[in-house]
């Protein structure tokens, strides 16, 4: 897989700059440091691309030997991705003799977004439907295809290539995220997608490219390079932090509901500020009223081989025998083999109750009050 260039208004960051247009130019002033998670995702994409091309009879070079983050889990995930795409291709062949299938296709949506381009993992065109499939290797954030601006930008780029060649009337977008057991699909008419592009995407992209518009903080701040020093984010969180807090029983229900809706972002922001200040201090910056000290440290062996030798000579066993945890075991065996051998021995206890917004897709728990009411209803 060829190295990818990055646009100022990239599709992958579109959720952020569509909500907060000035963040695009602000982030341009920061170095792109990357992360281990991003590198792992790049490796997974390369492996998935190879498997798909091989299955489709296209020339491809096996990248496995050069993949730093290769694992049995990645092998399983990318095999599942390839199988899923092939299933969609076979389904397309039921209504179209010769569907168009493209892997890692560069798309250009600069008609709406200045310098707008990206790479679609898979595009399938058949029977009036343009289908875009995107592989997500990430585990931390569940990604939905519904109203996903990255997917909509890729779809617009694909329409730029093929709308004049094929009679397309519907666009289907799928997120394949195997480590979260998530396959999310969203469909939209071509007309509605173009309407969004003209009425929302294009005018907001013009603001963002010019560095104009208003700063707005929200969950999209999580991947913003400027999140630690952003004044708008600080002001929004400090406004909540300066709330005239009383003992919780004295707050009204409405006040508590407002706080619940914002407290996670407040905690995240505070954590980001602490980490930023620490890294700056380690680089030599002095913060008034604060100093660097050594944190708590645990004892450790400085020569494990010598410890083993000494303990064994004394007649003791220095090793602890402990079963691998579920995540480590799945990584060792691979998901398919893990499921085959151990599914019967896995249980998932009830999780600890937590308050989440109503938009959360998990079903609501039954409280003791609800259980009591249900019992009375059944009497």
Tell where the protein language model's regions lie, with residue ranges.
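Metal-dependent nuclease catalytic cores that hydrolyze phosphodiester bonds in DNA/RNA
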Residues: 1-130, 170-172, 263
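Short, polar/flexible loop-turn hinges at active-site or ligand-entry regions and domain interfaces
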Residues: 29-37, 56-58, 139-145, 162-165, ...
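DEDD superfamily 3′-5′ metal-dependent exonuclease/proofreading module
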Residues: 1, 46, 52, 56, ...
